[in-house]
């Protein structure tokens, strides 16, 4: 899929295959999803290619506060302060925590370095952790961002992957932006769960998105799933991946495997696609957390060996 890619008349997919941003056109423009800082310069070139001036962009939408969904925005906000950052009300605490922001910016720096080492990008902004990250507009379940010309973006809370994870539904386009709320996907057909926060909330969130039944599902990685059948397939496959993982963890526990042994197996099998850019120790930590969340769901306590 060559980028920029026209998803609908009013929505354009930008960024890269691995890290997506969406340009949404109303009377003004919004950018949904913020990718990593390494995508900043290619993204700005794409805007120029589309003849979209910065003055036309009014809102920058962060659907959850993980570094790989927000780090193009520091440069944009610094250059163009009229752009308003939109995110969950839960992020007031995160965006004012120097310690948390330092971790976010450090993770972004590591991924940017990996992108350079692999020749995916040649340069990137040199960002330094701020004392706070701006949050101009907070949203919650049922909030609406009206961009004009019928482009009303309604927000839904879809926790599970993270407590602050949001979806955004544009009914006029039949488009649901799900960020990472619908699990991880790597083309062509590899689905796996990502409930770092809570398993039961992840299940409810996917069921909520299935009830919306969008025509198009826009992910934060690997682009837009166009067509109701494909959107349904993606939501169902990610829902099934949760069930499969629950069964897998229970089976391994019953066979006497330790959390560390299960984590080693999962890390090897699940760290595919854009996750290959992550440091190995970070992937290990994330998949161990997924296993721990699964055990918590079942009320199983295990001592580490």
Where in the sequence are the language-model features?
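C-terminal functional module detector
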Residues: 233-251
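C-terminal regulatory/interaction regions
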Residues: 249-305
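Active-site HxH/HxHxD metal-binding segment of metal-dependent hydrolases
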Residues: 49-143
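Conserved beta-strand hairpin/beta-sheet module of binuclear metal-dependent hydrolase folds
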Residues: 1-50, 167-180
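Residue-level marker for buried hydrophobic side chains located in beta-strands
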Residues: 30, 61, 85, 175-177, ...
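Metallo-beta-lactamase
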Residues: 36-38, 152-236
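Divalent metal-coordination and catalytic microenvironments
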Residues: 10, 24, 33, 64, ...
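A short catalytic or substrate-binding loop motif that flags glycine-/basic-rich loops and adjacent residues
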Residues: 14-16, 137-139, 159-162
């Amino acid at each position: 899929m060559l980028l920029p890619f026209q998803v609908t008349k009013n929505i354009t997919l930008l960024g890269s295959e691995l890290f997506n941003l969406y340009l949404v056109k109303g009377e003004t423009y919004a950018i949904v999803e913020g990718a990593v800082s390494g995508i900043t310069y290619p993204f700005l070139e794409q805007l120029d290619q589309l003849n979209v001036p910065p003055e036309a962009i009014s809102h920058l939408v962060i659907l959850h506060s993980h570094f790989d969904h927000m780090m193009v925005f520091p440069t944009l906000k610094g250059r163009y302060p009229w752009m308003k950052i939109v995110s969950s009300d839960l992020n007031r605490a995160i965006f004012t925590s120097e310690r948390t922001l330092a971790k976010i910016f450090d993770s972004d720096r590591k991924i940017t370095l990996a992108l350079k080492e692999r020749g995916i990008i040649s340069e990137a902004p040199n960002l330094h952790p701020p004392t706070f990250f701006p949050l101009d507009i907070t949203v919650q379940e049922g909030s609406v961002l009206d961009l004009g010309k019928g482009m009303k973006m309604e927000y839904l809370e879809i926790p599970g992957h993270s407590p602050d994870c949001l979806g955004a539904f544009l009914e006029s386009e039949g488009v649901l932006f799900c960020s990472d709320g619908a699990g991880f996907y790597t083309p062509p057909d590899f689905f796996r769960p990502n409930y770092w926060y809570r398993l039961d909330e992840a299940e409810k969130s996917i069921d909520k998105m299935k009830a919306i039944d969008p025509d198009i599902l826009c992910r934060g990685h690997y682009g837009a799933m166009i067509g109701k059948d494909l959107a349904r397939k993606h939501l169902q496959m990610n829902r099934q991946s949760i069930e499969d993982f629950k069964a897998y963890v229970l089976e391994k526990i019953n066979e006497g495997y330790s959390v560390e042994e299960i984590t080693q197996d999962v890390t090897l099998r699940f760290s595919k696609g854009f996750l290959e850019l992550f440091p190995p120790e970070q992937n290990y930590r994330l998949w161990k957390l997924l296993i721990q969340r699964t055990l918590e769901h079942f009320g199983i306590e295990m001592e580490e060996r």
